[in-house]
Each structure stands twice: as C-alpha cells, then as structure tokens.
C-alpha cells in the first residue's frame, strides 16, 4: 500500500511519514517549504517539491497511491484576519486542488486534517456533533474544505475521514514563525533570554497535545477500513491550562526568569478553546500519555538542539489595521 502525505516536511506530516514507514508502507509526499523544514523529512520518503495548488502535477504524481493524508496548510488562524487572501488560498484552494487530483488519480481514501477553528466561539469543550461556527477566515476556509470533501466524495465514491487535531506541540514544530505555535514562540524567545509576550490577560484556556499521542489516531483514520466518514477531535481534554500557566512552564524548562510582557488581545482569538476527546477514545483508542509539562520540556529540548533563531516575518501582512504591535513592529 502507498500513502501520500501533503505537507510532509511539516510538523504533523513528517511524524506521520515516520509512523507509516515504520509500519512497512511506501510513503510519498510534497511540500512547498513555506512552513516545513527540509530536514524533518525521512530520507525514505519519496519527496516532491511543489505546491498543492498545482492540480495537474499532483494528479500525475498521485497515480498508484491508495491513501492521501492532507496535512499541508498555512495554519495561521490569528494571521488570517490580516492576510486573508494568502491564508485562504493556501487552505481552501490547496485542499480542493488536492481532492480533485486524488479523485482523478483514483485514490481510495482521503484524510483531511482540519482544525478546532471549525467550532469558533461556542461553549467548550467542543464536540464533533456541534454545528460548525468559525469566526475567522482560517476556520471558514477549513470548514469550506470539509464540506467540499464530503460533497466530492459523495459524488465520486472516494472514502473520507476528517481529523481535528488541536494545539499539538513537540519536536519539529516551526519555532521561528511569529504568527503561530505559542509555546514554541515563547521557548524561542526565552532561550534567547527574552521575555514571552502574552496577548490579553493570559487566561485563555487550552489543552496542548503532544505529537506522539496524536499520530496513532490519524494512522487509524487512514488505515482502518471500518472507520469511514468520521470527524474526530484528536488530543487531550483533561487538565486544560491557561496561557499564563503555560508561559511559566516554558520559562522553567528554558531556565529563564519568567517576566512576561502583556499586550493587547488579538482580534477574534477564542478565549476558551478545548475539545472533547470522548469520540477519539471510543473510536480510535486515544490515550494521553504525555502531560503538558513533559511535552513542553521535549519541545524546548528540540529548540535547544536546533538552536534558537530570529523570527521570520517573510509572510508579511496584507492588512495592518488593528494588527498586533508585535507583528506590525516585528517585536518578537
């Protein structure tokens, strides 16, 4: 069996590739390297350097593959209200292009990696039965891609599952991106002896997921023939913590005196965003094996090994009005 992973140089995609390879599957994948690191990619992966929006090339490459796991995304929810064209183009257009190519190439199953942004500002914990209610262009694009996938699969017979991973942390995560990955941003600053920035009062509530705890669930969504047409939250629902608490854990792991700088709230940021894991436990056997303290320590160890970096602002802002000062003034 052959499995193709989009965004295979990214955080999630590269770990999935390792998992499938360890199980004896042939793995191919592509990346445009906007967000991934080339050295994340296992040398056994058949790697293609191109953008998912190149539908014709994607279709030609996908011939012979049985499963596509679509991880590729500009996963920048907060940035999406300031660079909506860039973000939605690389979420919706890239996703639909890949779906179309997969159908053309007679791929049997498509696993779409969505986002908890699909739930918006509803009462937490979010369950899969909730209506989608995204509050920003990123979430809107993810939900539109989900709906398109279901529509296309209904017409053309391709199997589908949708994974909803949330707040994943661990080694290989992009840590020089100023717009996403809050714990890695804090660690990258603290390791350079710079204080963390916290948006608003810091009481935003999150459940952080360690990468290794999530991989087996996505593996089952890809490989288990008895699991079809399912949407599943992936990650823990126990022991949510505030951003203030997370910042203290990061500082401790970095051996840095914790003196955060509080700045204004980010527009459209959901205050209390946690997901129920009940369905993942029942259907996929999800289990939280790594607590948040250990997850942070492993993330910090990875950044230490790679070396902290200056932040990369190359994406820029399409709209600067009301954007966080940390982004406009490149303060990170």
Where does each model-flagged region fall?
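A contiguous, mid-protein "functional segment" used to position or interact
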Residues: 279-314
